[in-house]
Amino acid sequence: MSSGAPLNVTNPNYDIEESRFGKIVCYDQSLLFEKREQKGWESGSTLASSLPFFITQLFVANLSYRVLYYLTRPLYLPPFVAQILCGLLFSPSVLGNTRFIIAHVFPYRFTMVLETFANLALVYNIFLLGLGMDLRMVRITELKPVIIAFTGLLVALPVGAFLYYLPGNGHPDKIISGCVFWSVALACTNFPDLARILADLKLLRSDMGRTAMCAAIVTDLCTWVLLVFGFASFSKSGTWNKMMPFVIITTAIFVLLCIFVIRPGIAWIFAKTVKAGHVGDTHVWFILGGVVLCGLITDACGVHSITGAFLFGLSIPHDHIIRNMIEEKLHDFLSGILMPLFYIICGLRADIGFMLQFTDKFMMVVVICSSFLVKIVTTVITSLFMHIPMRDAFAIGALMNTKGTLSLVVLNAGRDTKALDSPMYTHMTIALLVMSLVVEPLLAFAYKPKKKLAHYKHRTVQKIKGETELRVLACVHVLPNVSGITNLLQVSNATKQSPLSVFAIHLVELTGRTTASLLIMNDECKPKANFSDRVRAESDQIAETFEAMEVNNDAMTVQTITAVSPYATMHEDICVLAEDKRVCFIILPYHKHLTPDGRMGEGNSSHAEINQNVLSHAPCSVGILVDRGMAMVRSESFRGESMKREVAMLFVGGPDDREALSYAWRMVGQHVIKLTVVRFVPGREALISSGKVAAEYEREKQVDDECIYEFNFKTMNDSSVKYIEKVVNDGQDTIATIREMEDNNSYDLYVVGRGYNSDSPVTAGLNDWSSSPELGTIGDTLASSNFTMHASVLVIQQYSATKRQAAVTAAAATTVMGAVAGVTGNNLESAGGDAKMTRDAHEPFMKSMYEDEDEDDEEDHQYGIHR
């Protein structure tokens, strides 16, 4: 407290002075360690020491942040909004000035303890920021992102300085330092949050998304350089630092030390430990201790300790398993528990009421709007000179306003050096809040991807000619899904005349730990090091299994892909990838797995929802495989044995059954496959009881007859094919016939049509017992545990442009109605402070069938090619 300030003698423990720099508290530190007569259980108050108070503060901070996060999630706002609101909730203008909060939650005498833990959490959080940033992504081949980034910085810095000076509230002695920190906070762009916004809107793989991310990386790195310069230029009192040359030189030496000594040294040590097979907790503790040591070094150099933590995070080898081990041990605890303390500290420093005493309200609005528009205008003008479309330029400019924890770090750095007083600090905090509120909703509303997905003809197996390549997208969640799908592909008769092109996609759930570098997967930046050990090992094994299938068959090509997405929008990635690769058939695993006793377990409900969504939105035909031991087909049949493998195709009628027949027909070329096609024909009693209109039934029956006739004509001389017709009157007759078939022949695989929305007389009465609508009536019956114990089932739905467009339109209408009503949907939440909720904001494939595009053009989805 400055000399001559009036003392508050009403409280002998501490005195408070209020100035433009906020509340300055002076208290007797010996009171914290005051010896009391009561000992142990005789203590008069359990909250008399700092530890119980800290636990209380930790609980209040986490509870407040969680409540605000859940309240802002339905509005599709980033977690950064909840972070700022959590701090402002306890600001002096809201709850921070109440007697109860001051006395029992955030007393002034324990502020030092709170700030200590908050700063420690910040140091480790910045370390994780550097740990998750892969500098290989800075290898930019185009100059457009670099020009956009530097132009935005060069314009935002002087404009930020002018906006700081415009209200006339800055302290006269701190104008220069205040302009620097205000400008840096305005110019910075938070790369991790920007990447997650693009992931939410399915724009990561768009040209606009790539340009924005590259520009954000350059801006992020330049922000750190400017921040270090700000630390070095000004002393703790906000005036020029006479030791600035020493600070800059020592900091530059430490940077070179990290590049040429620390990084190679850590890489060498970890290479030795991995070779010896010893990577454990000791190495993690070594790294965590190094964070504190590097922070101490940069603090001694004259810059903030977060600089050392960030540089040390960049120094950890990107491809080493230790990165993932550190994130698993540190991320959730840090961002979910300790970081809310930092937000509370930011809020305690902001005083909206105090700011309004010095700031004109109209001028405050002008400054906030100007702060947001400066990057948009700059980016648009720069982009137009580089022939970037206007809509893309506007979207990039809006994304450059993405703020995050780094912006708060800059403001608090200016607050610590007294470069920013309380009104200006509060003013800028509100500006950051407004920018965060506007960016993603504005982008979702104003930017609609102009590119549509490619138009292609072969969207069904039935339309594939005998000498045309069959392109299949095989989806895998976990390793047990692989064996059945690979063996189904093995018996799909890939030949030189009709090759099989397989795109095997490993579906990985997007969680709060997923770093921005994992979201932005490409050929140069491989994301393996960011996976957990289990997922990484599983992904490798899945890729090896599919690649081995390619080695054993010259007529088959395999490309393995890893898709990272939340369950709520995973079907979008599957559909977009299917359209992009021009596949005509998607294979999905059934969500239930076989138990040791031969029955079907409960399964994963999220996987079931994915299957249902894919069936509704798929751009091609879809098959769901219920695997009950398809591995037997490969293990025995491909050793040259003469034993035939029995495949039964159950034909009821309709487009789905015709598609199923086409796929089963393709298998006939395999010398080990024996196909039996059973057509169920409704009897006269069934037609009369069902009340079928003659014209409707005859029209559909005519198409079925033509398909069956063609099949019989072309396979009449094939001894491996058998065709049977069964007359049935209802669903019970159909089930009895299938049971009779099972008793007389042991089938390995059933191929059936889904028969969605079909009301066939031969399945009458079976719909009442259906538990899995995605399998259809016959498929659900065959998949039930009490029907068959060893035969796998492939349920196929044929692509229909009319049905798909209707489903997409209905889904879009539901989304709009849900947004109006405040319905949140099934969006995924994550526990981390940097976690980003996802949303089903738009359908990038609604009118894909009407637009043409180049085959190799990448679309708005995120996936990585496994080499």
From Swiss-Prot:
KW Transit peptide (keyword) present? no
Q: What keywords are annotated for this sequence in UniProt?
A: Antiport, Chloroplast, Endoplasmic reticulum, Ion transport, Membrane, Plastid, Potassium, Potassium transport, Transmembrane, Transmembrane helix, Transport
Q: Name the source's superkingdom.
A: Eukaryota
A Pfam family this protein belongs to? Na_H_Exchanger
Where are its TM segments located? Answer: 43-63, 75-95, 112-132, 146-166, 175-195, 212-232, 242-262, 283-303, 336-356, 362-382, 393-413, 427-447
Tell me one GO molecular function of this protein. Answer: antiporter activity
One annotated Gene Ontology cellular component of this protein: chloroplast membrane
If researchers knock out this gene, what phenotype do they report? Mutants with impaired chloroplast development that display aberrant chloroplast structure. No defect in male fertility, due to redundancy with CHX21. Chx21 and chx23 double mutants are male sterile.
Asked if the Swiss-Prot or TrEMBL record annotates the protein with the keyword RNA-binding, the reply is no
Biological process annotations from GO: pollen tube guidance; potassium ion transmembrane transport; proton transmembrane transport
Protein localization: Plastid, Chloroplast membrane; Endoplasmic reticulum membrane
Question: Where in the body, by tissue, does this protein show up?
Answer: Specifically expressed in flower buds and pollen. Expressed in leaves, roots and stems.
Region annotation (Disordered) maps to: 848-867
- Principal localization reads plastid
Per the record, membrane topology reads:
Multi-pass membrane protein
User: Where is composition skewed (Acidic residues) in this entry?
Assistant: 851-860
The job of this chain, per UniProt, is described as: Operates as a K(+)/H(+) antiporter or Na(+)/H(+) antiporter of the chloroplast envelope that functions in pH homeostasis and chloroplast development. Monovalent cation transporter with a preference for Cs(+), K(+) and Rb(+) relative to Na(+) or Li(+). Required for pollen tube guidance, but not for normal pollen development. May also be involved in the development or function of the female gametophyte.
Supply the PANTHER family for this chain: CATION/H + ANTIPORTER (PTHR32468), CATION_H(+) ANTIPORTER 21-RELATED (PTHR32468:SF74)
Q: Which family does it belong to?
A: Belongs to the monovalent cation:proton antiporter 2 (CPA2) transporter (TC 2.A.37) family. CHX (TC 2.A.37.4) subfamily.
The protein's name in its UniProt record: Cation/H(+) antiporter 23, chloroplastic
Whose protein is this, by species? Arabidopsis thaliana
